[in-house]
């Protein structure tokens, strides 16, 4: 299995180094739900600005403040402790009056707004995230500038970031140990983290192998394609290849790669053979996903950061701004720019 730091680069390995996240203010994330609260209902959506607090800690504190069980507070995604983040929490408070959130006191946190909502906010139920990152101690400004222009035009690999695999790859190692044991894993969080790490590692491997081909973004017979910004996909046939290629070149369609698991992978013929060959050596992880009945799915191979802009504060410091759809990793953008000083796995997204 190829380690995250050695996965194939779309724009070649960066020439220079730099520092990501010297302090929390260098990594700012603003959650974009993609909808506005209903204004009525038994749930309350609370938008919180936090610095130095992880999401679960804040959710538990909010539950205590509202005098409800911790399971009644949900969120769409985990946000990093060591960053400045804005995100929405959702509390189920049927039959209760609107609380006075000005009385909610938690160091590093501030309630920005709140409103009633009809539905629970579930994990993954957000449109995306807006990022503002500051990269420091950059050793090669010219190379980074060239890469930013290339990323604006051609995107980056849609890799799952090192955070998915845990500090030192602990989640992936856990998955491997579990796969080779008959002992059940009863901890739901561990099960979720380990299965997610296993499937993500296989996806990354497939994408990395495809990027080694000079024509990696050329549609082949049996590829599965996805409308940009949509979840559904369809299979390419040989008769359609010229027209489908035109739509891929115009970024209207995206070539996808497999999230392996139980059931059909989606690809057929030439594309399926390539994906199977790319992870043929990873039988242990594939067997785990089948044993635990994880359903196969698809994910776009490339990621195009939206609203990408940058501002050089000086020759060694640049501020980046961009928006990514839910499930994408800012660190997968950064790894195409610089060889980072520090451990990606400490940055949750």
Curated annotation (Swiss-Prot):
The cellular component terms of Gene Ontology attached to this UniProt record, alphabetical and capped at eight, are: cytosol
Tell me where in this chain the TRUD domain is found.
155-303
Q: What GO annotations for molecular function exist for this entry? A: RNA binding; tRNA pseudouridine(13) synthase activity
Catalytic activities:
uridine(13) in tRNA = pseudouridine(13) in tRNA
Q: Which UniProt keywords apply?
A: Isomerase, tRNA processing
User: By its UniProt entry, which PROSITE patterns does this protein fall under?
Assistant: TRUD, UPF0024
Concerning CDD domains, the annotation shows:
PseudoU_synth_EcTruD
Q: Which Pfam families match?
A: TruD
- Enzyme class, UniProt record, top EC level: isomerase
Sorted alphabetically, the Gene Ontology BP terms of this entry are: tRNA pseudouridine synthesis
The record ties this protein, via SUPFAM superfamilies, to: Pseudouridine synthase
User: Active site at which residues?
Assistant: 80 (nucleophile)
Q: Where does substrate bind?
A: 27, 129, 329
- Under Enzyme Commission nomenclature, its number is 5.4.99.27
**Does tRNA processing count among this protein's keywords?**
yes
Database matches in InterPro entries = PsdUridine_synth_cat_dom_sf, PsdUridine_synth_TruD, PsdUridine_synth_TruD_CS, PsdUridine_synth_TruD_insert, TruD_catalytic, TruD_insert_sf, TruD_pseudoU_synthase
PANTHER family on file: TRNA PSEUDOURIDINE SYNTHASE D
Concerning its family, UniProt says: Belongs to the pseudouridine synthase TruD family.
Q: NCBIfam families from the xrefs?
A: PRK00984.1-4 (NF002155), tRNA_TruD_broad (TIGR00094)
Task: Tell me, in a sentence or two, what this protein's role is.
Answer: Responsible for synthesis of pseudouridine from uracil-13 in transfer RNAs.
Q: What is this protein called?
A: tRNA pseudouridine synthase D
Q: Which gene encodes it?
A: truD
């Amino acid at each position: 299995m190829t380690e995250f730091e050695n996965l194939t680069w779309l724009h070649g390995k960066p020439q220079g180094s730099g520092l990501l996240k010297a302090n929390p203010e260098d990594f700012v994330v603003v959650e974009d739900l993609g909808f506005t609260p209903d204004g009525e209902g038994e749930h309350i959506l609370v938008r919180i600005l936090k610095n130095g607090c992880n999401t679960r800690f804040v959710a538990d504190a909010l539950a205590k403040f509202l005098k409800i069980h911790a399971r009644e507070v949900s969120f769409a995604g985990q946000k990093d402790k060591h960053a400045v983040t804005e995100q929405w929490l959702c509390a189920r408070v049927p039959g209760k009056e609107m609380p006075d959130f000005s009385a909610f006191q938690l160091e590093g946190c501030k309630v920005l707004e709140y409103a009633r909502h009809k539905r629970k906010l579930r994990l993954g139920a957000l449109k995306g995230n807006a990022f503002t990152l500051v990269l420091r101690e950059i050793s090669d400004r010219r190379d980074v500038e060239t890469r930013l222009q290339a990323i604006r035009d051609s995107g980056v690999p849609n890799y799952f970031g090192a955070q998915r695999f845990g500090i030192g790859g602990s989640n992936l190692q856990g998955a491997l140990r579990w796969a080779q044991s008959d002992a059940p894993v009863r901890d739901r969080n561990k099960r979720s983290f380990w299965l997610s790490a296993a499937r993500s590692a296989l996806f990354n491997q497939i994408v990395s192998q495809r990027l080694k081909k000079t024509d990696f973004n050329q549609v082949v017979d049996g590829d599965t394609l996805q409308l940009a910004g949509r979840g559904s996909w369809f299979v390419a046939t040989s008769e359609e290849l010229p027209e489908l290629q035109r739509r891929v070149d115009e970024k209207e369609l995206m070539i996808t790669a497999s999230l392996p698991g139980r059931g059909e992978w989606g690809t057929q013929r030439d594309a399926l053979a390539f994906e199977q060959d790319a992870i043929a050596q990873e039988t242990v992880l594939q067997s785990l996903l089948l044993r635990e009945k994880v359903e196969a799915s698809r994910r776009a191979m490339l990621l195009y950061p939206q609203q990408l802009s940058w501002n050089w504060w000086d020759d060694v410091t640049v501020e980046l701004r961009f928006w990514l759809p839910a499930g994408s990793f800012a660190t997968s953008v950064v790894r195409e720019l610089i060889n980072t000083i520090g451990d990606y796995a400490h940055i949750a997204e």
